[in-house]
Every structure is written in structure tokens, then in C-alpha cells.
Amino acid sequence: MKKARILLADDHPHLVEKVTQLLQPEYEVLGAVSDGQALVSAAERLKPDVLVLDVTMPILDGIEAAKKLKAQGCESKIVFLTVHSDPDYLRACLAAGGLGYVSKSRMASDLLHAVHHALTERIFISPTMTGQK
């Protein structure tokens, strides 16, 4: 079976490295970009199955980048990685087409679940983001 292809977007190189280690070898990580504008360009060119992106990035934030990609017909599933626990961010990410909303503090336990859910068109939200433990 072919591995799902993932593109990462985060402006913190050490976090990109950790995310890559978590996702491989189960998934093929195509690479990483550090801002939303670069994400839009790379996603159009590479056509990944899943985008794992930070909410807060320079030039174009993750939410705006996701909206732009969806408006352009991008079919990649979107999983947001974030430090934001504010429900307004969660709602904005879901409205932008996100299927995953993962707390960076729970990345090790939640990210693979979120990607799997996204690939099967299901929503995954880190339990801490919904007030659960």
C-alpha cells in the first residue's frame, strides 16, 4: 500500500524535525515550509494527501493559507498544529477546512491519530482543546 504524502508548515525548525520523526516511517514527509505563502505554492506543486500546519506563521497564517488553498480547489486534508486553546481558533480552523486540531503539547500522542482521522475524512481534536483530559 502506498504511504500517504504529507507536507509540513511551521516556522520553528526544531518542531518540524520532531513532527517528521513522529510521522515517519508510517507516512512519507515531502518536506517543510516556514510560512503560509510558501505553503500555498508547495501544496499546489506537490499535491500532498495531508497538510500539517501551524496556525501562527509569518506572511500568511495557517488559517488564511488553508482558506486560500481550499478556494483554489486543493484536495489535501488539513491538520492544524497549535498552541492556541481558544475556541475561536478551533472554530476558525474547522471553518477553513481543517479536519484536525492538535495541541503542540500533545503532539506525540495525538498527531498520528489526527492524520489518520483526516485521511478517513473524520475530525480529530486534541482532548485538551475541548476541556477533556
Regions found by a protein language model. Give the residues of each.
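Receiver (REC) domain active-site loop signature in two-component systems and cognate sites
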Residues: 57
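Short, flexible helix-to-coil linker/hinge segments that flank and couple to helix-turn-helix
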Residues: 90-95, 99-133
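Active-site residues of response regulator receiver
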Residues: 54, 82
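Conserved phosphotransfer cores of two-component systems
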Residues: 44-46, 68-75, 96
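Conserved sequence signature across two-component system core domains
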Residues: 9-10, 33, 51
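Acidic catalytic/metal-coordinating carboxylates
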Residues: 35-38, 61-64
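Two-component/phosphorelay signaling modules centered on CheY-like receiver
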Residues: 13-31
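Active-site beta3 strand of CheY-like receiver
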Residues: 46-52
